[in-house]
Amino acid sequence: MKFVAFRGPLILILFGHVCAAALWCSDVSRKPRVRAITAFVSIDRATYGKQIQDTLAMLRKAKSAFEKGGYEVQTIRITTQPFPQYTRGITKAEALEFFKGLDALSKKEEFLANVGPAMLNDQDDSAVDLLADILVSTDINTSLVIAADDGIHWNAIRAAAKTIKYVEDHSANGVRNFDFAAAAFVPPYTPFYPGSNHNGRGHQFSVGLEGGSFVADVFTESHGDPRIARELLSHKLAEHARSLEAIALQVEKDSGWSYMGLDATPAPGPDSSIGAAIQQFTGTRFGSSGTLTAAAIITDAVRSIPVKRVGYSGLMLPPLEDSVLAQGWSEGAYRIDALLAYSAVCGTGLDAIPLPGDVSQQQLERIIGDVASLAFKWHKPLTARLIPAPGKKAGERTDFDFGITGFPNVILQPLP
């Protein structure tokens, strides 16, 4: 879609010290996309094939409904209850055969699959080896829980670091770490992967957005004024949120599936950079002063929408999914510590972070531990999705291929 920059005037009304946009002008901002319609199911190994087909029938009707409403839909997804619950009593080999079958079905029917987290209990690591083998044997998403209301899960942190190194060594160029997250406080019914999870009866769905270009267009209209930026973004995001919720509630009525809510986190995409949006606001490169303010404005706007919300409801900053963020990473404009600082006001933690292949398990434990500590301190959803590049050192360029056209590679930076 061709981008026509807004050039018209804004009429402002002053209320004391607050300047709010009273005339929203002609709306030239590009629509957010629907990144994911995610269904949550409680599967039975014996009947899962029929369960998946019934779920796909709902998802495809939902996709059609959103498209008729004017929203592009990128993916449909299915998240199961935590996989250790339905692999008890069978051998590891039998479990892997089951997951390979689920993976083959997902490819045939064109949906993304997530089998939920392991180690809900920090003392139970019995499913960790199976989790690692699921990752290297299939294209299924999964996660480990590293912090929750009961505290920081230090055993799970060690298990996550061990898993990342195993997957680095046992999958093609380590790319399967892309579909694994060490997750803290990620709430149920989150539509985004890999942290998506639920532990209930199923028969529910939620919706997640992509919106880098949408945010960039709104920030163009704000001319760098933080008050106007927040008001404009809140107003325009709320308009779309109401429209999306109306469609979702009609799907709920027609299908009998329960709608759990919208995660309006404006995820980036190959042609929809959230890094570019933030630079549009600050007038300088990502990582400079003002970046934290932009992150806070976006998060405040996302959390202000007057609809049912789920998930992170914040901001994603994945260097390996966003060309502008990738360029800044390659230039050393920001590092892991900066992303953790931004996570204090937004989310979603350390997402799609490229690391040198010689990063040690102990270094990974410390990084994941920082994410868990921050999440526990503020009781907020954060994840660590860390992707070491096998055989690559700081200063060298990655050559990842995640199977998604437009995802960038970067120059690796030394660890802090």
Regions of interest found by a model, annotated:
Residues 24-416:
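Anaerobic metallocofactor- and corrinoid-dependent redox/one-carbon enzyme cores
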Residues 9-20:
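Bacterial N-terminal signal peptides
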